[in-house]
Amino acid sequence: MRSTGLVTVFAIVIAVLVGAQAGSSAMSQSAPAPPSPGQGRLIVYGDIALFQPPGHPENCILRNRFKRGDPVGFRMFVADPSTGKREESAQLVVHLTVGGRTVDIPMRYRATAAQPEREFWVAKWLVPQETPVGIVRFTVTATDKYGRTGEFKPFEVQASQLTIAE
């Protein structure tokens, strides 16, 4: 009877150890907690397009070459770095370098009750008549309610830069 009691105690000890190990493994395999709000850099990306009035056949066509008087459209998306989802509190500004000076253009959030699928920010710049022909450098900065920031810069490939042509 004494050996049966020892076997039972030994079996219970083994079961407890195996259970503790299984729980420990499950905990170590769970997803890590997302970072606290306010940490990380915002993810900012987008494109430029011709912003003609709605119904115009060339409205929203992607391009990088524009003429004086053309409406350049900037479209951007901002994501929270911890979730990958849209950061609705973000404030965006386009910074253009034109003729040796910087022009700042605030962006606005595009989605409306009638068009909720447009979950991006937009800004329009009418190319002034006095703008020199050539490349116009730009960046877009974003800041959210937590103080996080992010920046979009186009690729450093001359052929893909915002360019003013005759």
Residues covered by each model-derived region:
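Conserved structural position at the C-terminal beta-strand
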Residues: 140-142
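A short beta-turn/strand-edge loop motif at beta-sheet boundaries
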Residues: 65-68, 82-90
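Short, solvent-exposed loop/turn segments at the edges of extracellular beta-sandwich modules
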Residues: 82, 144-149
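Solvent-exposed serine/threonine-rich low-complexity stretches and specific carbohydrate-binding patches
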Residues: 92-93, 100-116
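Short glycine/proline/serine/threonine-rich loop/turn segments at secondary-structure transition edges
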Residues: 129-137
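Aromatic sugar-binding surface patches on proteins
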Residues: 114-125, 132
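Short beta-strand elements
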Residues: 148-166
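Short, compositionally biased P/S/T/A/G/V-rich stretches that sit at domain boundaries
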Residues: 27-73, 78-79, 163-166
